[in-house]
Amino acid sequence: MNSKCETIKPQVVNSILDYWNLLKPKIMYLVVLTGITGMIIAPGSIHPFIAIISTLCIALGSGAAGAINMWYDSDIDALMTRTKNRPIPAGKISKSSAIELGLVLSVISVTVMMISVNYISGILLAISIGFYSFAYTMYLKRRTPQNIVIGGIAGAIPPIIGWTSVTSSISIESLILFLIIFMWTPPHFWALSLLNYQEYEKAKIPMLPVTHGIFVTKVHILVYSIVLFIITLLPGLFLKDYLLYEICAIPLGITFLFHAFKVFTSSNYYKYKAMFTYSVAYLFILFICIILASF
């Protein structure tokens, strides 16, 4: 009996971890942070319970979109080394279970957000889930090299959701946070595509290096990085401690530009990887700086 229980427990734990990975937790962490940032810097107050509900709905919505994405992309995930060990291509979760979970979490997160927080936040969450799941995953990703540019709209909405959870309205401040994420997304994913462009080509995904070449991709990374740097200076105009923010944001942005320039002037795998790795840490730290500078 004990040996049977000991066998069952690891299986249960592994199954839970597989479903957790289906929700793309690394993306979820960043989405939740940006949503919380929108809540914190918004004028006015929000009941702690409502803030928790809003945060959970944003997390569930992100997970729902991740599950639907993995369901639809399981065929191409199986072709790429980077993604072949994901739950569905690895045979750990069935496609039907994945889509069922994604749809259930979508309905729950949007419904609870509408009822418990407000309608505009629920509508924005529905748009974010729908845009990522349908516009990006099912249409843009396999049809245009601008897939991550347009698809980046979905990932840039959460700070607006956080803001509207408090104010029930959209303002210029929340749109600036939206723009930061929107401009960050292309250089982040283009760095990844430089690392894996042969696999994208094999899977017939029209990423920019596949359709327009490596040099054009490098130019795009540099241009978007410059525009991103300029936009990241704007939150200092409305944050309480603008000096603290700029002291954080400017060095972060210069380092981002440094990595982008290194990518532009080099064909070194490790330069591409350094750009991709730094871009993840960059956005986390930048939004933490925004939070700290709001007090």
Swiss-Prot record:
Pathway: Porphyrin-containing compound metabolism; heme O biosynthesis; heme O from protoheme: step 1/1
InterPro entries membership: Protohaem_IX_farnesylTrfase (IPR006369), UbiA_prenyltransferase (IPR000537), UbiA_prenylTrfase_CS (IPR030470), UbiA_sf (IPR044878)
GO terms (BP aspect): heme O biosynthetic process
Transmembrane segments: 27-46, 50-72, 93-115, 119-136, 148-168, 175-195, 219-239, 244-264, 275-295
MF terms (GO), sorted A to Z: protoheme IX farnesyltransferase activity
Pfam families reported for this sequence: UbiA
Catalytic activity: heme b + (2E,6E)-farnesyl diphosphate + H2O = Fe(II)-heme o + diphosphate
Protein family according to the UniProt entry: Belongs to the UbiA prenyltransferase family. Protoheme IX farnesyltransferase subfamily.
This protein's name: Protoheme IX farnesyltransferase
Organism of derivation: Ehrlichia canis (strain Jake)
